[in-house]
Amino acid sequence: QPPTENGENEEAVTKMMYMERRDADGNIVGLLDEGLWFKQGDEAPYTGLVVGMNKPKDGKPPEFPYNYKREFQDGVQVGVETGWYTTGKKRIELVYENGEVVSMRQWDADGNELKED
């Protein structure tokens, strides 16, 4: 990322609605197909955060602004993906390595971790 005025690198952030997955030939493919993630209109695979925002309800802002956060490096999902309930309590946490999920944790709306059977 280019440095900001104070010389630090600023991380890119976008919304999923502005992202697309492309195959090796540059064709847009489905979400589950093989390919790299790009911000629409960009030539290079995306590096940065992708966030989902909770929408206002009944004209009031949401209690918690985000419903998920994902991290991408050179078009591949990496790091921790976190999903939240509208209250701000954690709903799910997925850990990615090279685009593959390597671990997952889930919580109920009260914040209790759900155990796998």
Region locations from a protein language model:
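Glycine/tyrosine- and acidic-biased, solvent-exposed loop/turn segments at the edges of beta-strands
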Residues: 1-117
